[in-house]
From Swiss-Prot:
Record gene name: nuoA
Compartments where located: Cell membrane
Residues passing through the membrane, by range: 10-30, 66-86, 91-111
Taxonomic classification: Bacteria, Bacillati, Bacillota, Bacilli, Bacillales
Domain of life: Bacteria
Primary role: NDH-1 shuttles electrons from NADH, via FMN and iron-sulfur (Fe-S) centers, to quinones in the respiratory chain. The immediate electron acceptor for the enzyme in this species is believed to be a menaquinone. Couples the redox reaction to proton translocation (for every two electrons transferred, four hydrogen ions are translocated across the cytoplasmic membrane), and thus conserves the redox energy in a proton gradient.
Protein name: NADH-quinone oxidoreductase subunit A
Cross-referenced InterPro entries: NAD(P)H_OxRDtase_bac/plastid, NADH_UbQ/plastoQ_OxRdtase_su3, NDAH_ubi_oxred_su3_sf
Amino acid sequence: MASVYENSYMIVLIFLLLGILLPVVALTLGRMLRPNKPSAAKATTYESGIEPFHDANIRFHARYYIFALLFVIFDVETLFLYPWAVAYDDLGLFALIEMLIFVVMLLVGLAYAWKKKVLQWL
């Protein structure tokens, strides 16, 4: 029985090593095999043939990041809700209650963000 567990961990270890090794090898080979001919034209930014007239480093207000995080949270919620909605007939009442608890937890978080006035635009 122990060999089954060891086998499972060995597969995970192999995938972990391959997941690290293959990108490192690909990036290293790409760096060694690519032509390296730096020039001033390659160092400039290019957008529609027009030279840039100001610095590309722009600071964004922190509220934009909060909106982005809230979007990601509710986007992931739809990823969890979709398989549940597809298999709704087979899952039964327990899955309905479980999903309702999940949605209520997210709505409580949204209500908390609303109460703290996080959702007000600048």
